[in-house]
């Protein structure tokens, strides 16, 4: 009796696998953070290598035509962002927004990557897109505040961080950003 060969993954297969990969990335990132806090550099490197491999696999899936491509680029972007490969991560998130221009989460991730590369004008643009598509989350507004502050647009930056604080008053990151902006403004 011949055993049938399974030669093609369905869209549902790709979707399920990519979501599993994304969830595993979050676990690995948490493990890497804990290992880093303990000073266990070999464990950090091991987790980062796994994260990179998952990113490469997700990018490979994204090269296969289908509805899953956007998710493949997104997971690949996350993996590269997690290991501070900012330019590659930004490229992946740009690919996501080319496919799905209203994907606010991809714009948010792109904002972060561009900021890490010191590309403040592009970071502002991505943050504005993120606030457009995810207007009721503090993260896009705080990222916009950071970009605007770096560009010397203090009044706009303060307005953006105040919006972030309105949306998420208990988020310590937003309060820290506001305090940092105020102290830097006082120094200048």
Residue spans for each PLM region:
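Register position in tetratricopeptide repeats
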Residues: 82, 116, 150, 183-184
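Short coil turns that delineate tetratricopeptide repeat
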Residues: 66-67, 101, 135, 169
